[in-house]
Amino acid sequence: MKPISFIIPSRNNLKYLKWCYNSIRKNLGYIHEICIADDASEDGTWEWLQDISKKDLGVKIHRNKGPERQGLVVLYDKLVKDYSTNDVIMIFHADMYACPGLDKALFKHLKKGTIVCATRVEPSLHPPGPEKIVADYGIEPEEFDEQKFLTDLNNFRDKEKITNGIFAPWAI
């Protein structure tokens, strides 16, 4: 399998970012690169990123010192252009959980010139859409019912459905 560069900007979202990082490493292993940008956070994100990048050589970090935010789009571009080294790019949010087999499922559908979106599973906080499954496994990382989610994962209807919806997470 080819390695993926996960592109993750974050601002003052440390507990979610840790949860996201841990899900990638736990469920997908260390083959994939994780490129993370801190957008002038004040919650300890930069200090945690410095620590984790010393322990995990597959993590590349960038910091916007601020005081002004740069925003997601600028930081996505920065991470893709200056930090990612793989042919496949996965646009991810700091509050997303990487399911077991996400990488294999992406490569099953990814062809040259296409964009593949993973299905989002989230509680009914936002309007429904074709690209997501509405289900509640907890909103905060400490509330996340991982065991129930993983048990239900294989039973989701339409998990192989192809839609025209596009929203992160997506890979190119």
Regions flagged by a language model, labelled:
Residues 151-172:
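A recurrent flexible, glycine/aromatic-enriched loop bordering the glycosyltransferase active site
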Residues 116-134:
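Short beta-strand-to-loop element that shapes/binds the nucleotide-sugar donor at the catalytic cleft/hinge
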Residues 65-83:
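Glycine-rich, basic loop-to-helix element that forms the pyrophosphate-binding segment
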